């Protein structure tokens, strides 16, 4: 979000480098100017911080503000909304990629499953949990495969087993709810 439309000559120069995309170059709340910019350059724009819901996604695509969408489940309200955005983008031939937000292994399990959907055709912002956590709250270690992928967990539920000792160790507050 560091640029404005006054930087159009810079963006046109960037076109010469055949970049895969330029992510969120303008203000997060300005899909109108993103649409103007996208019409002027060859490089695909990817909206990230502008996307908080399916409604934002629809508006951005209909206005021509981008050709790629970054989906971050934590930003859009969870996996149900993420799946709706994925499906809508697929119906409009707009590729998506997954952005992570430093989730624990529980969130990472959901993110890896989400990123395995068919319209996530760009490399996703997912990494091994050891990159950020010396000890995670799941037993499963997410590792990069030699081809750069991460295997989708296949266990029951979200596919991973919670490390109850680690969860207890890192819990800062408990609340009991009576039926």
Give the predicted meaning of each segment.
Residues 137-179:
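C-terminal extensions of enzymes
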Residues 12, 21, 29-46, 51-149:
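Shared catalytic-loop signature of beta/alpha-barrel
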Residues 7-10:
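Metal-coordinating catalytic core of metallo-dependent amide/deamination hydrolases
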């Amino acid at each position: 979000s560091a640029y404005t439309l006054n930087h159009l000559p810079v963006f046109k120069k960037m076109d010469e480098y055949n970049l895969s995309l330029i992510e969120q170059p303008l203000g997060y709340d300005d899909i109108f100017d993103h649409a103007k910019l996208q019409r002027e350059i060859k490089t695909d724009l990817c909206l990230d911080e502008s996307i908080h819901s399916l409604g934002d996604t629809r508006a951005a695509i209909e206005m021509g503000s981008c050709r790629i969408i970054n989906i971050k489940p934590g930003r859009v309200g969870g996996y149900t909304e993420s799946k709706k955005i994925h499906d809508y983008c697929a119906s409009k031939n707009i590729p998506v990629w997954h952005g992570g937000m430093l989730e624990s292994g529980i969130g990472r399990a959901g993110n890896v499953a989400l990123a395995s959907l068919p319209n996530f055709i760009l490399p996703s912002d997912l990494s091994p949990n050891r990159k950020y956590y010396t000890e995670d709250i799941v037993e499963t270690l997410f590792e990069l495969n030699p081809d750069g992928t991460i295997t989708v967990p296949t266990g029951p539920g979200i596919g991973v087993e919670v490390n109850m000792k680690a969860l207890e160790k890192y819990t800062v507050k408990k609340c009991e709810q009576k039926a």
